[in-house]
Amino acid sequence: MFSLSGKTALVTGASGGIGAAIARQLHAQGATVVLSGTREAALQELADSLGERAHIAVANLSDPAEADGLVAKAEAVAGAPLDILVNNAGLTRDTLAIRMKDSDWSQVMTVDLESPFRLARAALKGMLRRRAGRIISIASVVGTTGNAGQANYAAAKAGIVGMSKSLAQEAGPRGVTVNVVAPGFIETPMTDVLPETVREKLIGSIPLGRMGNTGDVASAVVYLASDEAAWVTGTTLHVNGGMAMV
Amino acid sequence: MSDIADKVKKIVVEHLGVDESKVTPDASFIDDLGADSLDTVELVMAFEEAFSVEIPEDAAEKIATVKDAIDYIEKQKAA
């Protein structure tokens, strides 16, 4: 089950915690992975640790031209057409709306919403022709629930859901599926520094009684990327320990 | 047959996987050649690339037959 042998996957934001976990699990299922991000050394280190079937493609997704060109670049380094696109790269510029600068808004929109569209558009051209493909975008529970201090991020992540549903309708007749994974609170270096009382309160709001880990998110991506998920499209798979049942 | 007509025909055969004999000037992409709406968009994009022309959305909507495509591209190329 869930073999990705012979498939080629591009993972953006692969130098981050969740992105690296996604790349590792796709690779473990047999996929050839192209790791993308801005930090070349970190990407190379991950590629080296994976060994065979791992390539890197450095790209800064805040630059529209680099976003537009990344799929072609990934296919060139992998030497194969792209079967799986994982839009994982993202950034946050958290602050309350009344203090939010235009640049806080636009940077998040460009990287978290516009670049996934650019990548999906480029990937779809080949996928539609080949009548196969998987596009999986990483959103967030806050795209559904909202979150104080994240008007920009929540809007971008909600946008990912609407975009993916539209693309799923366009690409469905060609057997290409488009889905979203929406993580809740995931253990990362960022959440490690939270005070213990805040952590406890956070965990208290999660029925499954713990924070998520990056592997929880990666497993959901593997499922959606697999042949077994062939009849699942336009959906959002919430991976949040039951914190928000939507 | 003009070079443009020849090339259009070739693109249609390639993209829709239909027999060359079916690609007559009056053949409708959707009604006669089995194209769906996504096919027609892909065809228009293939024409744009092959002939280095831009086919705006409102013009693309009017291209229903092989002849429509040839006429439109010939007009663009002549302009």
From Swiss-Prot, chain B:
User: Which of the residues bear the PTM O-(pantetheine 4'-phosphoryl)serine?
Assistant: 37
Q: What Pfam families has UniProt attached to this entry?
A: PP-binding (PF00550)
Q: What domain of life does the native source organism fall in?
A: Bacteria
**Pathway participation:** Lipid metabolism; fatty acid biosynthesis
PTM comment, free text:
4'-phosphopantetheine is transferred from CoA to a specific serine of apo-ACP by AcpS. This modification is essential for activity because fatty acids are bound in thioester linkage to the sulfhydryl of the prosthetic group.
Q: Which Gene3D superfamilies match?
A: ACP-like (1.10.1200.10)
Q: Name one GO biological process term.
A: lipid A biosynthetic process
Instruction: Name the HAMAP family on file.
Output: Acyl_carrier
Q: What does this protein do?
A: Carrier of the growing fatty acid chain in fatty acid biosynthesis.
Family, according to the entry, reads as follows:
Belongs to the acyl carrier protein (ACP) family.
UniProt-recorded name of the protein? Acyl carrier protein
State which gene encodes it: acpP
